[in-house]
């Protein structure tokens, strides 16, 4: 019995240190623009989604249009230009919950230079996700991809876990992407300098 408990503990520790494994896809249709979500979003002060004006580029974000989480303009990801940091998260992802205040801190200090965009990914608990947004104080724009449309959409890999970061340059190219659990704003600043060439 103790051996089984030890194995389970090791598996749980591995999950916490390496990210959260994705659950199976849920129902075919999940509404991310309901009156309740709109009210919660407004109360949280989440900024509106801003569609881009660019054309698709090689190595850029995929030609995938996602709805604005909690209502607002849909966004074709391929139209976006950086420098920008894109974060994929979900309410069921423990490490995502822990790092969201770090992302918000970065947003508050550097949004004019490097905007932050969050994507609630493969998350069927949309009310719980918006509650998490309220709890963590997130205000940067949020899209939703409850059916994991981005999974394998070039240049994204087959998603195995969260949290996930992508760095987009001024030409709209994804210059770097990785599964990473942020522990400090400085860690994110270092990644921005390394991959986007910006020292903030």
Per-region residue spans from a language model:
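A generic structural signal for alpha->beta connector loops
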Residues: 82, 113-114, 139-140
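N-terminal targeting signals for export/organelle localization
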Residues: 1-67, 200
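Hydrophobic alpha-helical membrane segments, chiefly transmembrane helices and signal peptide h-regions
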Residues: 3-15, 83-84, 102, 121-122, ...
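Short active-site neighborhood of thiol/selenol oxidoreductases, capturing the structured segment around
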Residues: 74-97, 103, 116
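A short beta-strand-turn-helix
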Residues: 56-58, 63-84
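Thiol/disulfide oxidoreductase modules built on the thioredoxin-like
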Residues: 134-138, 145-200
């Amino acid at each position: 019995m103790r051996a089984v408990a030890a194995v389970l503990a090791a598996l749980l520790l591995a999950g916490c240190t390496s990210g959260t494994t994705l659950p199976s896809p849920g129902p075919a249709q999940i509404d991310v623009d309901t009156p309740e979500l709109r009210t919660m979003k407004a109360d949280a002060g989440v900024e509106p989604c801003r569609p881009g004006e660019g054309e698709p580029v090689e190595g850029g974000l995929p030609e995938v249009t996602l709805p604005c989480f909690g209502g607002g303009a849909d966004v074709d990801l391929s139209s976006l230009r950086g420098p920008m940091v894109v974060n994929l998260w979900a309410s069921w992802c423990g490490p995502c919950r822990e790092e969201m205040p770090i992302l918000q801190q970065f947003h508050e200090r550097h949004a004019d230079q490097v905007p932050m965009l969050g994507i609630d990914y493969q998350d069927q608990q949309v009310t719980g996700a918006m509650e998490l947004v309220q709890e963590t104080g997130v205000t940067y724009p949020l899209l939703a991809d409850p059916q994991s449309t981005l999974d394998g959409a070039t240049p994204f890999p087959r998603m195995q876990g969260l949290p996930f970061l992508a760095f987009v340059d001024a030409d709209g190219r994804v210059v770097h992407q990785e599964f990473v659990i942020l522990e400090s704003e400085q860690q994110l600043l270092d990644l921005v300098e390394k991959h986007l060439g910006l020292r903030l």
